[in-house]
Design a protein with these regions (language model features):
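Active-site acidic/histidine proton-transfer and metal-coordination neighborhood
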Residues: 4-12, 27, 48-51, 68, ...
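Mobile, glycine- and charge-enriched loop segments
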Residues: 22-42, 78, 82-95
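Structural preference for beta-strand elements that scaffold enzyme active sites
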Residues: 32-39, 61-63, 89-94, 120-121, ...
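Short active-site-proximal "capping" loops at secondary-structure junctions
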Residues: 42, 66-72, 100, 252
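Glycine-rich, proline-tolerant flexible connector loops at the mouths of alpha/beta enzymes
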Residues: 63-86
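Conserved residues at the C-terminal ends of beta-strands
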Residues: 65, 98, 125, 206, ...
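Histidine-acidic metal/acid-base catalytic patches
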Residues: 1-34, 43-57, 162, 166-177, ...
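A conditional alpha-helix N-cap/helix-loop micro-motif detector
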Residues: 43, 74, 103-104, 127, ...
Length: 280
């Protein structure tokens, strides 16, 4: 069977997916985009609390960080997580950010975990000496590596740093563009999306007040993020149906009422931007 994902389709190209899926209302709200959350945003909650809050926010896609879902060989633990998510019709869109080095066996443990958990995208910070290993692993498991930029001073600070790193490697080694960190690196997030193109498998929707290393996070669109422009660019490059499109809001993790209110504001702005992009 050829799935929407394997055919390179996008949610907004395939109305039958929307009609058949329990995620219909959420997908329609966000213009057909599979918007979810990076669970690091909810690190002030335990894993069960993070899942519950994600559900209450009306989101069906979650990108876990290891603090909520540690990498494990234990199938029982993975199955327990799967059951929790299945009850809410939720999907793990990605896991990370995970480090990779030259140790192939250690790298493979992450892929084995991802395969067990049904995770298609691994957000990653791979060392330069990891790429030969990763070429073999993405081919063996058919799971993507999405290189995450961490802002000024990091390995993949600028757009060109990432593009140079993946040159000549398996196309399943691509990118998770943290748009907030690109703002800190004085890069234009919309240009980032266009340049990374069909190797873009993940997005961290994030905004910062200033284009410099030390700054603070703000509600989407209140800093330097052109929210409608981001979604127009994602439509242009045909962001994949099984990619990870995650809101990441890092402020006030332990002030739960403020955190959830701010996340709600970000999601409302994202929905508005996504619908504007859909309308052209």
């Amino acid at each position: 069977m050829v799935t929407a994902a394997s055919a390179g389709a996008t949610w907004f190209d395939i109305p039958e997916i929307l009609a058949a899926s329990g995620k219909n209302a959420s997908l329609n709200k966000y213009g057909g985009f599979p918007i979810g959350i990076q669970s690091y945003s909810l690190r002030g909650f335990g894993v069960d609390g993070a899942i519950e809050q994600t559900h209450k926010l009306g989101l069906y896609f979650i990108e876990f960080f290891s603090g909520h879902f540690p990498i494990t060989k234990d199938k029982i633990k993975v199955d327990e997580m799967t059951k929790k998510l299945d009850k809410r019709d939720m999907t793990i869109s990605a896991h990370g950010v995970n480090g990779f080095g030259a140790d192939h066996d250690k790298n493979e443990l992450v892929f084995q975990f991802a395969k067990m958990a049904g995770i298609k995208n691994i957000s990653a910070n791979p060392a330069p000496n990891s790429f030969d290993s990763l070429d073999k692993l993405v081919a063996k498991y058919d799971i993507r590596i999405s290189i995450h930029n961490h802002g000024p001073g990091a390995l993949y600070d600028k757009i060109e740093d990432g593009l140079k790193a993946v040159k000549g490697h398996d196309k399943r080694i691509g990118f998770c563009a943290d748009l907030g960190h690109y703002i800190r690196s004085n890069e234009d997030p919309v240009e980032v999306i266009h340049k990374l193109g069909d190797r873009l498998y993940g997005i961290h929707l994030k905004d910062f007040s200033e284009q410099k290393k030390r700054t603070h996070g703000v509600i989407l669109g209140k800093g330097h993020l052109d929210v409608p422009g981001v979604f127009k660019a994602l439509r242009k490059i045909k962001f994949p149906a099984d990619g990870a499109l995650s809101l990441e809001y890092e402020e006030t993790p332990n002030d739960h009422p403020k955190l959830l209110a701010d996340i709600g504001k970000c999601l409302a702005i994202a929905a508005d931007g996504a619908l504007k992009a859909k309308q052209g």
